[in-house]
Amino acid sequence: MMTYEYILVRYGEMTTKGKNRSKFVSTLKDNVKFKLKKFPNIKIDATHDRMYIQLNGEDHEAISERLKDVFGIHKFNLAMKVPSELEDIKKGALAAFLQVKDDVKTFKITVHRSDKRFPMKTMELLPEIGGHILENTEDITVDVHNPDVNVRIEIRSGYSYIMCGEHMGAGGLPVGVGGKVMVLLSGGIDSPVAAYLTMKRGVSVEAVHFHSPPFTSERAKQKVIDLAQGLTKYCKRVTLHLVPFTEVQKTINKEIPSSYSMTVMRRMMMRITEQIAEERNALAITTGESLGQVASQTLDSMHTINEVTNYPVIRPLITMDKLEIIKIAEEIGTYDISIRPYEDCCTVFTPASPATKPKREKANRFEAKYDFTPLIEEAVANKETMVLQTVEVVAEEEKFEELF
């Protein structure tokens, strides 16, 4: 019985790129290679319009599961490679069809003749190949409109690829082609989703988390570490900066009117994050804000908060409602971590009546009464930085270190 020998990857949005497409292809190949480190026998060939992964006996199902999480992949197919001879193509199409699930009742054949010198036309090939499958199966019919399985055949010079089992990729662009941003990672539901959607646009992320011991616990800190760890499923690594925020918050609580304490706190976070962004050569700041969700996420609040940074502030969730955000969080595996009942620094000092329409003039006037600069610099200087990778990669590195 024939087995799958290749996975053919289609790029999707990357095909709209022009002269710089080679950069996108190269980055995607590098990301796929990193994602599939556990499979040493594979060989990856990335061309201008698609990628070919030669399996060489590796587990195609396990590899397929990993490819689903790689940004830049639109779709991919399991494939067999056969000589470009009619009988070989017919046998290969039947073998590929027989490997799909038992509950399949209908199919169609799709043929693409990349080699126009092949002696038979597409309309001549369809009944030949389809008829061969019908003759060698039972209770199977052709459905060209809504088939259970589409047997795709790509005829090239000398050899042909036969594909079944189409899988959807993660879409978007390869992580790394779009620069780097700092993501404010609070520990809630929204910010990990914002990080995920930012990565989907090809942007590398580093996370900044503000914690305020003893008001926030070690369990709350670990929760954020686990969230950052979870995001490594979609990239090579996530660098997490843990910023001590206790003194800043205590001073805000003491010096700033309570109605403006939330606004000023967010402004301080932006100032600190901007300094870290400068150190780390990041080009923007990403937040998990959704318009109108809480008092600090009104247009007036965002207008006042934005004043303190010259960096672009990316808000991927800005027009989403909570249910849409939760749906994505569940799909990417961060929801169950986010709902762990540990408070973060934004909740422990929440004012009773925060201003929903704060003004820049008032915020500046309140802040001018106290010099926050030393506190900001101290918070940046005392941050804890850790680099997180997928559990598999960490295990491999530890195993390698044990050899020495």
From Swiss-Prot:
GO molecular function, one term: CCA tRNA nucleotidyltransferase activity
GO CC, any one term: cytosol
Chief location: cytoplasm
Signal peptide span: none
Keyword Membrane in annotation: no
Binding site for ATP: 184-185, 209-210, 266, 288, 297
Stretches assigned to the THUMP domain: 61-166
Family matches, as Pfam families: ThiI (PF02568), ThiI_fer (PF22025), THUMP (PF02926)
Tree of life domain: Bacteria
SMART domains in the record: THUMP (SM00981)
Keyword Transferase recorded: yes
BP term (GO), one: thiamine biosynthetic process
Reactions catalysed according to its record: [ThiI sulfur-carrier protein]-S-sulfanyl-L-cysteine + a uridine in tRNA + 2 reduced [2Fe-2S]-[ferredoxin] + ATP + H(+) = [ThiI sulfur-carrier protein]-L-cysteine + a 4-thiouridine in tRNA + 2 oxidized [2Fe-2S]-[ferredoxin] + AMP + diphosphate; [ThiS sulfur-carrier protein]-C-terminal Gly-Gly-AMP + S-sulfanyl-L-cysteinyl-[cysteine desulfurase] + AH2 = [ThiS sulfur-carrier protein]-C-terminal-Gly-aminoethanethioate + L-cysteinyl-[cysteine desulfurase] + A + AMP + 2 H(+)
Entry-linked PROSITE patterns: THUMP
Keywords: ATP-binding, Cytoplasm, Nucleotide-binding, RNA-binding, Thiamine biosynthesis, Transferase, tRNA-binding
Pathway linked to the protein: Cofactor biosynthesis; thiamine diphosphate biosynthesis
UniProt-listed HAMAP family: ThiI
Membership in a protein family: Belongs to the ThiI family.
Designated name of the protein: Probable tRNA sulfurtransferase
Protein species of origin: Bacillus cereus (strain G9842)
Gene: thiI
